Swiss-Prot record:
One of its GO terms (biological process) is arginine catabolic process to succinate. It comes from Shewanella piezotolerans (strain WP3 / JCM 13877). The keyword Hydrolase applies. The gene is astB. The active site is at E174, H250, C369. It catalyses: N(2)-succinyl-L-arginine + 2 H2O + 2 H(+) = N(2)-succinyl-L-ornithine + 2 NH4(+) + CO2. It is an enzyme of class 3 (hydrolase). This is N-succinylarginine dihydrolase. Catalyzes the hydrolysis of N(2)-succinylarginine into N(2)-succinylornithine, ammonia and CO(2). Substrate binds at residues 19-28, 110, 137-138, 214, 252, 363.
Length: 445
């Protein structure tokens, strides 16, 4: 049977804006209050997803969340019509309004953690939406994320869906951005790497001092239990607290893995050598490639600014691996020089493809943030909601949909415009029909 690693990218929502909501994310903070282009952002994401499909990869799309989130604004005491709720929130609590208008669900690397059927006791593909409790604007996502996942992977013979973890910082969970999987082949049992920032129940354990550690060891262990993983195919690694304090808010900003390659910065982890030995031991005899980028070649600051590690490492139908990088990597001399060298180093990575995702990058999310990886066999791929899979027809339909519903420009002040609610709901209602999702949104229920 054939096996694939599919990428599911998040469609950028109609309220894409730069509100600087993500403390610890340097790009997000640096671009706060800039004017965004929801239309450009959505089209950049759709174009990137189509390009990967054209490379021969299995590519799907996730719908965005309903924003502005009037349900949450009402839950915290704002009353009246939709227009009155927005007006009151804009006057009395503008920061809360901004949080309820974020299009951050486009970064589907944070949507969930996924364990393929080759790794799990029951032989099913497991999904757990991330609770994202560290950031208010993301903590309101998990219920709708679960609805969208279930509408996309809706065959219970193959797919097992879990509720997100308890909404407490002890179980802070940021999804696949802190999880990667190493394997000899996508269909073989692999090693699932869970990377955490701190131990919630051990105050004396190392943790960052300046920026928050968003993922806890306790959350990672809970996911592994839910997904029915063995100790023999799980490794827990702590991210270096010093790099978190330098703006590496998720592990996918400093490391990325694919099949038998782990591509990471020299400073990415604590106890690196011991953990690499554990991975080798559990991985077995098959070839395994650790590609370590030394600080002398790429400083942490350059890695964060360019998002060198927030690239996608993908296996092409030819068997060669390619890096899908943002154009920012081309524009950074040290990073560009390193990538040119990387393809000559003898690892399976032989190609680099550059994509313009600047609207996402300015809010702190590169190519890897925009996708959730799902390793599947051909029966599982066939069981996915096919209306979510990228092809020529969906590409054309989504571009037409964006042209019809999205604004060219959006400022933070525009978030209080009642017309934006109507535009957004009209767009999402039509999208659920295009992608055959059913009633996944609060306003449809």
């Amino acid at each position: 049977m054939k096996h694939f690693e599919a990428n599911f990218d998040g469609l950028v929502g109609p309220t894409h804006n730069y509100a600087g909501l993500s403390f610890g994310n340097v790009a997000s903070l640096n671009n706060a209050a800039a004017t965004s282009s929801p239309k450009d952002a959505a089209k950049q994401g759709i174009k990137k997803a189509k390009a990967l499909a054209d490379l021969g990869l299995v590519q799907g799309m996730f719908a965005p969340q309903e924003r502005p989130d009037l349900h949450t604004l009402r839950r915290i005491g704002f009353t009246g019509s939709d227009a009155e709720v927005l007006n009151k929130a804009a006057k009395e609590a503008p920061a809360l309004l901004r949080a309820c208008c974020s299009a951050s669900s486009m970064w589907t690397a944070n949507a969930a953690t996924v364990s393929p059927s080759a790794d799990t006791h029951d032989g099913k593909l497991h999904f757990t939406p991330a609770n994202l409790v560290d950031k208010l604007h993301r903590s309101i996502e998990p219920v709708t994320t679960g609805n969208i996942l279930q509408a996309t992977f809706n065959d219970s013979r193959y797919f097992k869906h879990h509720q997100h973890l308890p909404e407490h910082t002890s179980f802070g969970d940021e999804g696949a951005a802190n999880h990667t999987r190493l394997c000899s082949e996508y269909g073989h049992a692999g090693i699932e790497l869970f990377v955490y920032g701190q131990e919630a129940t051990n105050p004396s354990a190392p943790k960052p001092q300046k920026f928050p550690a968003r993922q806890t060891l306790e959350a990672s262990q809970a996911i592994a239990r839910l997904h029915q993983l063995d100790d023999d195919n799980t490794v827990y690694m702590q991210q270096n607290p010093d790099v978190i304090d330098q703006g590496v808010f998720h592990n996918d900003v400093i490391a990325v893995g694919n099949q038998n390659v782990l591509f990471y910065h020299e400073q990415a982890f604590l106890n690196t050598q011991a953990k690499l030995e554990e991975i080798k031991r559990k991985f077995g005899e098959s070839p395994l490639h650790f590609v370590e980028v030394p600080t002398a070649k790429v400083a942490i600051q350059d890695a964060v600014k360019s998002y060198l590690f927030n690239t996608q490492v993908v296996t092409l139908p030819s068997g060669e691996m390619a890096i899908i990088a943002p154009t920012n990597c081309q524009e950074n001399p040290a990073v560009h020089a390193y990538l040119n060298e990387l393809v000559t180093l003898g690892s399976p990575i032989k190609q680099v493809h550059y994509f313009d995702v600047k609207q996402s990058m300015q809010n702190g999310g590169g190519p890897a943030c925009l996708r959730l990886r799902v390793a599947m066999n051909q029966d599982e791929v066939a069981a996915v909601n096919q209306n979510t899979m990228m092809n020529d027809a969906l590409f054309a339909r989504l571009n037409q949909w964006v042209d019809k519903h999205y604004r060219d420009r959006l400022s933070v002040a525009d978030l209080a415009d009642p017309q934006l609610v109507i535009e957004s709901r009209t767009a999402l209602d039509e999208l659920t029909q295009i992608m055959k999702l059913g009633s996944v949104y609060q306003f449809q229920r």
